[in-house]
Design a protein with these regions (language model features):
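Bacterial Sec-dependent N-terminal signal peptides
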Residues: 1-6, 11-51
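Chitinase-like catalytic core of GlcNAc-active glycosidases
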Residues: 52-293
C-alpha cells in the first residue's frame, strides 16, 4: 500500500509542472517579441543617405501600403536603397499609402519620385472627365478634347502656343508631385522604343519641358527635389544643354551581356544610339556625367 501511495505522489509531482507549462503555452493573448531597429540605427541610416556614396536605385510597383506582408509596402524596400521611382499607383493615394510613404521618407531617409513614360502633352494627368465626355463636350475626337484642355494648337507652327502648352503640362506634373509629397520626378524617356509623341519626338520641345520642370526639381531649382531621366537619356542629341538640369541619368540596359556593352552606352555609343558622354560631353565633364549615371 505504501508503494501505491509513493507511486501516486510521484506521478502527481511529475504531472504538476507539465500542467503549468501547458497552461503557459496556451495563453490566448499574442505577444510580440520583435524589436525593431533603434533610433540610433535610423539616424545613422539617414546620415549615410546624405553622404557622398554610390547610390542604390530601383522602381517600385503595385504599391498599396497594406497587407500582412510588406511586399506591397515601401517599408519592405531594403533600407540601403537611396531613391525609388514609383511605377503606377502614385495618384489618389490612400491613408495607408500616405503613412507608408511618410515613414520611409522621414525615418529611413529614402527618397521617392513619381515616374511615367513621357510622350505627348497631357500624358497620364489629363482629367478623366475629358476622356469620358469628349463627345458631349462637342469635340470630334478624344485627342481634340485633350489638346483643347492643354491649349495645344491645331497649327503646330504656332511655336508660342506649343511652348505655352508644354509648360502648362510640366507645371501640372509639378503640382501633382507636390500635392502627394513626393521627392521629385523621374522622366521615363524611350522615344526609340515605340513611345512617340509631340514632346519626345522633338528635342527642342523636350528641352522646353525639362526647362519648366527644372524650376521645381533638379539642381537648377534650389528646392532639393530630384529630377531624373531614365530610359534613353543619351538620345536627346540636339540639345546637350538639357543635361545639367538632371540629378541623375539612368540608362535602361536589359541583358547587356558584358561590361563593354555598358561602357559603350556610357561613353562612345554604338549599342543603343550615342553614349551619354557623346551627347552631353560638350557641356559637362566625363567625370560629372559618370557620377550622375
Amino acid at each position: 500500500m505504501k508503494k501505491n501511495y509513493l507511486l501516486y505522489f510521484l506521478l502527481l509531482a511529475l504531472s504538476t509542472p507539465i500542467w503549468v507549462s501547458c497552461n503557459d503555452w496556451t495563453e490566448s493573448e499574442a505577444k510580440d517579441y520583435f524589436e525593431g531597429p533603434s533610433e540610433e540605427y535610423y539616424a545613422a541610416l539617414r546620415a549615410y543617405k546624405k553622404s557622398d556614396h554610390p547610390k542604390a536605385f530601383g522602381w517600385f510597383g503595385n504599391w498599396t501600403g497594406e497587407g500582412a506582408s510588406l511586399v506591397n509596402s515601401m517599408a519592405g524596400i531594403p533600407d540601403s536603397v537611396d531613391v525609388v521611382s514609383i511605377w503606377g499607383n502614385w495618384s489618389n493615394i490612400t491613408e495607408a499609402q500616405k503613412k507608408d510613404l511618410k515613414f520611409c521618407q522621414e525615418v529611413k531617409g529614402t527618397r521617392f519620385t513619381m515616374c511615367f513614360i513621357i510622350t505627348s502633352v497631357g500624358t497620364q494627368i489629363t482629367p478623366q472627365h475629358i476622356y469620358d465626355n469628349w463627345e458631349s463636350m462637342g469635340f470630334a475626337s478624344q485627342q481634340e478634347a485633350v489638346n483643347d484642355f492643354w491649349g495645344w494648337p491645331s497649327d503646330e507652327s504656332d511655336k508660342e502656343a506649343v511652348e505655352a502648352s508644354i509648360r502648362k503640362y510640366a507645371n501640372a506634373i509639378a503640382d501633382t508631385i507636390n500635392k502627394y509629397g513626393y521627392d521629385g520626378f523621374d522622366i521615363d524617356y524611350e522615344p526609340n522604343y515605340g513611345n512617340k509623341g509631340n514632346i519626345v519626338d522633338d528635342d527642342d520641345r523636350m528641352f522646353i519641358f525639362v526647362d519648366e520642370l527644372g524650376k521645381h526639381f533638379g539642381p537648377k531649382s534650389g528646392t532639393g527635389k530630384l529630377l531624373i531621366i531614365d530610359g534613353e537619356p543619351q538620345s536627346i542629341k540636339n540639345r546637350p544643354d538639357v543635361g545639367p538640369y538632371f540629378d541623375y541619368f539612368i540608362i535602361q540596359a536589359y541583358k547587356p551581356g558584358n561590361d563593354n556593352n555598358l561602357d559603350k552606352r556610357l561613353i562612345d555609343g554604338g549599342v543603343a544610339g550615342p553614349g551619354l558622354v557623346q551627347t552631353y560631353g560638350s557641356v559637362m565633364s566625363e567625370e560629372q556625367i559618370t557620377k550622375m549615371t
